[in-house]
């Protein structure tokens, strides 16, 4: 639980709080974003505080922090609700974890150093008739198909693409984005500000040496990365709930034209109590899931529970916060209005809530896995 952290994890939290102080000191541009100079300063601060390498493997100079340590830091950063948290961590290995030889030299290491950018091409468009396919042809694979919701794909130097090989095995291929036949056919933006592209692969020749692992390992590699991201989203959700709680408490305790603070009203207190219950339960769920993940067992089901519960609780908490603050919370640019748009996507990212519910039930009823 958050209050029973050992000294090492309390130190992680203290360093994250120091990084938050650095974020507060940054000047913002006209759009409310961190400037280029500010980004460089925050990246330097993250290295100084030992945060930058937490997401990176030891073999590459990182500290390769565990799930609980990352949860503590991510929750602390999110609780500040400030631009700049993205600069706390260095790029993680993602599906390239464990890559050797050419893939390590030309893709993994440059990505970890920030020299190259990667994007994850996993999802087919809804109207796709088949999976993106890679046909073996001599010393190359010939890739045809389409991927949607490739976040950051327009800026990526290379793509990690889930493909189906002859015979049906799924695999991950590393594809340079400037390869002939890789076509960005649509750019779009989601409500929280994420930038995505739809990419078509038209007879794209990819060296066989760009196969990550072995045929059949594509889905397990992808799901390992997705699992890490789900826990990240749960930690972000709980941190944002802490920020909302503090904001609403200040509002309810403030002077009111009636002469009595809103927080003195019984109906308001009932709704605020519901928010607190959601936040307490979410944090308990999150921290238990992180500890299970650190224990070395397969924590896929527990992480699913944390992701679904925490992101849905966040939606309820933000919605009630707007109700308690009133109409001005819907004014464009109000922090709750911005948060309302931002958090809705969390219930869909890395697996929509009901899809994850089905997987959770399958884990127990079909595979007899998972803890309560």
Regions found by a protein language model. Name each.
Residues 2-5, 17, 68, 72, ...:
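Glycine-rich phosphate/cofactor-binding loops in nucleotide/flavin-utilizing enzymes
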Residues 47-114, 152-158, 293, 341-344:
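Internal helix-loop-helix
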Residues 114-123:
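A short, Trp-centered hydrophobic/proline-enriched beta-strand micro-motif
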């Amino acid at each position: 639980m958050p209050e029973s952290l050992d000294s090492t994890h309390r130190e992680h939290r203290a360093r994250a709080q120091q990084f938050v102080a650095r974020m507060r000191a940054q000047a913002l541009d006209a759009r409310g974003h961190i400037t280029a100079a500010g980004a460089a300063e925050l990246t330097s601060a993250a290295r100084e505080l030992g945060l930058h390498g937490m997401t990176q493997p030891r073999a590459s100079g990182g500290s390769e922090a565990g799930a609980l340590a990352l949860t503590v830091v991510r929750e602390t950063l999110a609780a500040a609700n400030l631009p700049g948290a993205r600069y706390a961590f260095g790029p993680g290995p993602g599906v390239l974890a464990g890559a050797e030889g050419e893939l390590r030299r030309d893709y993994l290491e440059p990505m970890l150093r920030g020299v190259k950018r990667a994007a994850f091409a996993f999802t087919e468009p809804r109207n796709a008739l088949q999976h993106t396919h890679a046909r073996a042809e001599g010393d190359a694979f010939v890739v045809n198909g389409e991927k949607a919701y490739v976040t950051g794909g327009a800026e990526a130097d290379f793509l990690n693409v889930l493909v189906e090989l002859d015979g049906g095995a799924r695999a991950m291929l590393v594809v340079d984005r400037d390869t002939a036949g890789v076509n960005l056919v649509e750019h779009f933006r989601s409500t929280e500000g994420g930038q995505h592209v739809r990419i078509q692969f038209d007879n794209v020749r990819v060296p066989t040496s760009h196969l990550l692992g072995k045929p059949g390992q594509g889905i397990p590699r992808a799901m390992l990365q997705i699992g890490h991201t789900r826990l990240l989203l749960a930690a972000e959700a709980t941190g944002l709930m802490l920020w909302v709680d503090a904001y609403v408490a200040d509002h309810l305790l403030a002077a009111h034209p009636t002469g009595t603070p809103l927080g003195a009203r019984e109906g308001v207190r009932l709704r605020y109590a519901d928010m607190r219950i959601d936040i307490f339960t979410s944090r308990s769920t999150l921290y238990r899931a992180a500890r299970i993940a650190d224990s070395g067992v397969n924590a896929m089901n527990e992480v699913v529970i944390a992701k679904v519960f925490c992101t849905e609780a966040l939606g309820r908490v933000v919605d009630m916060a707007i109700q308690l603050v009133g109409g001005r919370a819907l004014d464009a640019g109000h922090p709750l209005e911005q948060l309302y748009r931002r958090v809705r996507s969390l219930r869909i990212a890395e697996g929509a809530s009901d899809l994850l519910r089905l997987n959770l039930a399958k884990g127990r009823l079909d595979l007899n896995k998972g803890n309560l």
